[in-house]
């Protein structure tokens, strides 16, 4: 009897304990459900170091000398209005300095011209056709445009010279030609002048002469590494309104994949296609393989009227943005890949553990449900009462043991869970983070000091040629122009006044004479 009573009490206690712990309604199952893996967006991009052969050029000091010289010649003949030969032959003759003259000018910082001639007539007019000796030196000189023709039946010659000199520093550029790297000077109009690395380079343009001295120029070639972003370019095709990746279309594999490389070297950003020689203004980069010349950018011939910043500056800024964008895409792609990896790993672990702990999925979903797997990946969910969770493994008379809440009668088995040691299951590399960097800008060639001097000299000539002086030494016009301001006006007014008084006197004398004659006769 006692044994029966004990069994009954134990049974009631177990039933009561089971009702406290088993709080899920298995009769209200819903499903089936399947855990979904996160699908990452395919992006084949990586950050790598590329070994290249770098050719660079550095310049220092005064390495560029600009000189100009020209003469205004006006040769006239005055045969009267009926002579068809009357008139002037005017022209501006460029007389750019020779290489030896420009060297001498650069040392003395003076330019030399022939003699001026103003209103040289008769036999003196032969100076217009003489061999001029460049013996008159000036710091700078601007011409005066004379066109005198004031001597009847004689020829008249007018000569006026202009000259100038500028010694400055310019940057030479690099250009790829036939797989080789050469130095060039870029004119404001985009013309490329080959520069010798061992001897001075001299060339002329109209009345201007240029001399580049390579003494302060250093050109070197070295092997170096560039940090680049490598992106696989997969061709796509459109079929029936849908876009497909032809990399794997029809089960075929792209045996010759194409890649884009976006690289950075100090403050320069550029695209480095595979197997190509790419030239920036002061550096060229070459990879192994077949060489295809690429000027980057391919437009040095830029008019100074179209751009306040050169096209290279704009391209450099654009490629710096591309470089940083590629870095950001790489970082986001890495994060996306990590999320996908974590998603798959988490789902596998969750499926495995949820088959042991039927409350695991409910905890992850934030719902009070229990799970029951009916296949390796599909499961049913049943609603449950909420289970408290705190900073201890015990709650009231229950203890969490082996993945279940069970009855606990030994308080010594309880302990605090407020502190725990972290365990890193993943080995991720450090993310590359984009940052703001200085971008090197060069400006247009026309804004460089030497070329601005050329532009100013040409503008000064235009201003001078706008005005013509028809007068000279020994002419009546020179006498008139030599009077002070207001003198002619005063003389004219005095002439008019004196003329009026004279007429009054004459008329008075005539009247007096008439009266006297009447009395006599």
UniProtKB/Swiss-Prot annotation:
InterPro entries with a match to the protein in the record: Baculovirus_Gp64
Pfam name, any one: Baculo_gp64
GO aspect biological process, one term: symbiont-mediated perturbation of host process
Membrane-spanning intervals of the chain: 501-517
GO cellular component: membrane; viral envelope; virion membrane
Subunit architecture: Homooligomer; disulfide-linked (possibly homodimer).
Record-given protein name: Envelope glycoprotein
Species whose genome carries this gene: Dhori virus (strain Indian/1313/61)
């Amino acid at each position: 009897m006692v044994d029966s009573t004990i069994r009954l009490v134990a049974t009631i206690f177990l039933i009561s304990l089971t009702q406290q712990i088993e709080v899920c309604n298995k009769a209200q199952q819903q499903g089936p459900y399947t855990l979904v893996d996160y699908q990452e967006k395919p992006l084949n991009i990586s950050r790598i170091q590329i070994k290249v052969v770098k050719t660079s050029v550095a310049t220092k000091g005064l390495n560029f000398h600009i000189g100009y010289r020209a003469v205004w010649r006006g040769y006239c003949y005055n045969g009267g209005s009926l002579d068809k030969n009357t008139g002037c032959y005017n022209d501006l003759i460029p007389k750019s300095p020779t290489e030896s003259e420009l060297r001498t000018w650069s040392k003395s910082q003076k330019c030399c011209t022939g003699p001026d001639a103003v209103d040289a007539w008769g036999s003196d007019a032969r100076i217009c056709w003489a061999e001029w000796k460049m013996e008159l030196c000036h710091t700078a000189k601007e011409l005066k445009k004379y066109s005198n023709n004031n001597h009847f039946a004689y020829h008249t010659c007018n000569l006026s010279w202009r000259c100038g000199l500028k010694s400055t520093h310019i940057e030479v550029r690099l250009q790829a030609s036939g797989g080789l790297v050469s130095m060039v000077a870029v004119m404001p109009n985009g013309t490329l002048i080959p520069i010798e690395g061992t001897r001075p380079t001299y060339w002329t343009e109209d009345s201007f002469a240029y001399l580049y001295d390579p003494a302060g120029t250093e050109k070197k070639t070295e092997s170096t590494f560039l940090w680049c972003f490598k992106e696989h370019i997969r061709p796509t095709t459109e079929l029936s309104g849908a876009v497909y990746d032809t990399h794997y279309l029809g089960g075929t594999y792209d045996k010759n994949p194409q890649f884009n490389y976006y690289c950075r070297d100090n403050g320069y950003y550029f695209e480095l296609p595979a197997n190509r020689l790419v030239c920036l203004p002061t550096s060229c980069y070459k990879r192994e393989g077949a060489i295809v010349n690429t000027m980057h950018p391919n437009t040095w011939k830029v008019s100074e009227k179209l751009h306040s910043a050169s096209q290279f500056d704009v391209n450099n800024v654009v490629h710096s943005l591309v470089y940083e964008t590629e870095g950001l895409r790489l970082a986001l792609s890495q994060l996306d890949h990590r999320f996908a990896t974590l998603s798959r790993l988490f789902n596998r672990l969750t499926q495995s553990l949820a088959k042991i702990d039927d409350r695991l999925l409910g905890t992850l979903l934030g719902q009070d449900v229990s799970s029951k797997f009916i296949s390796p990946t599909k499961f049913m969910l049943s609603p449950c009462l909420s289970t408290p969770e705190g900073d201890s493994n015990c709650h009231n008379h229950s203890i969490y043991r082996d993945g279940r809440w069970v009855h606990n009668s030994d308080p010594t088995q309880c302990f605090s869970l407020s502190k725990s040691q972290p365990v890193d299951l993943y080995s991720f590399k450090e993310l590359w983070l984009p940052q703001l960097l200085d971008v090197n800008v060069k400006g247009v060639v026309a804004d460089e000091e030497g070329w601005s001097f050329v532009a100013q000299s040409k503008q000064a000539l235009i201003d001078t040629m706008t005005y013509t002086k028809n007068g000279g030494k020994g002419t009546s016009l020179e006498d008139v122009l030599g009077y002070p301001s207001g003198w002619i006006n005063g003389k004219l007014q005095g002439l008019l006044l004196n003329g009026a008084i004279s007429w009054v006197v004459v008329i008075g004398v005539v009247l007096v004479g008439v009266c006297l004659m009447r009395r006599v006769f």
